[in-house]
């Protein structure tokens, strides 16, 4: 049993330490995998060894591509923001996110504006004025951690109304928070739709209480309590596959 990430990763390191198993190098390794070996896959899309990968390589590849992600979620009737694959179909008076990098994360490759302000791109999603944003971590069809994005109190920069991330002064919190009752099942259904064994599902809620899935991360951040919760859940998953 090994952990392998798509690039050097503190989260993969933390997971390997919790599981007390070795990590595989992202570039070179003397490890020769066998079909009976299990590799805990942390965002890797390329088969390096002839082994059993958790998560499946193709599922991780699909989750990494924003177009493929939205198409699979739509096919499974998972609620997502209105999606366009051509600039010509956008409505002139609406605000959209243009995804210039289909494999970006943490706001990378996102441009916001009305159609005349946006570049040509392979994917556009309609802006939804969100009231809340959540992250639900799913492992083996169970939600093992729920968090909500909150404004960091001592942040002194300008907050973006569009992208809520650390750079814009937002942090995750889980204590003393009331979560929408349908949130866990939505996260599970979204993970199943992409055939993932585990993932961090980012979900927003609009002012009317509607929930929308934005993406599913397969190499998400791990620290503190999250490492413990995810690590124990993946340990159980490994034991089921041995």
Language model region names:
Residues 1-16, 29-35, 42-147, 177-184, ...:
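Active-site nucleotide/adenylate-binding loops and adjacent lid/helix of ATP-dependent enzymes
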Residues 16-23:
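Short helix-loop-beta junction
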Residues 105, 208, 221-224:
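Conserved protein kinase catalytic core
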Residues 196-208:
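A short glycine-rich, hydrophobically flanked beta-strand micro-motif that places a catalytic Asp/Glu
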Residues 119-193, 217-237:
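ATP-dependent carboxylate/phosphate-activation module, predominantly the ATP-grasp catalytic core
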Residues 76-79, 193-197:
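Short secondary-structure junctions
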């Amino acid at each position: 049993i090994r952990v392998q990430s798509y690039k050097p990763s503190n989260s993969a390191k933390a997971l390997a330490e919790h599981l007390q198993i070795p990590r595989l190098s992202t570039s070179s390794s003397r490890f020769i995998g066998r079909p009976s070996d299990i590799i805990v896959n942390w965002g890797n899309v390329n088969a390096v060894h002839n082994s059993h990968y958790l998560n499946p390589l193709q599922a991780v590849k699909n989750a990494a591509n924003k177009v493929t992600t939205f198409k699979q979620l739509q096919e499974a009737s998972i609620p997502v923001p209105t999606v366009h694959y051509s600039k010509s179909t956008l409505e002139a008076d609406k605000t959209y996110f243009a995804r210039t990098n289909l494999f970006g994360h943490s706001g990378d490759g996102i441009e916001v504006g009305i159609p005349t302000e946006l570049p040509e791109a392979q994917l556009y999603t309609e802006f939804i004025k969100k009231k809340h944003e959540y992250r639900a971590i799913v492992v083996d069809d169970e939600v093992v951690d729920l968090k909500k994005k909150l404004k960091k109190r001592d942040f002194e920069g300008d907050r973006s109304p569009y992208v809520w991330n650390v750079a814009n002064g937002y942090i995750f919190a889980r204590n003393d928070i009331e979560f929408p009752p349908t949130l866990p099942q939505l996260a599970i259904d979204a993970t199943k739709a992409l055939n993932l064994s585990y993932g961090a599902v980012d979900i927003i809620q609009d002012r009317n209480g509607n929930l929308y899935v934005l993406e599913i991360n397969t190499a998400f951040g791990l620290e503190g309590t999250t490492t413990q919760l995810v690590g124990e859940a993946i340990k159980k998953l490994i034991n089921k596959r041995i």
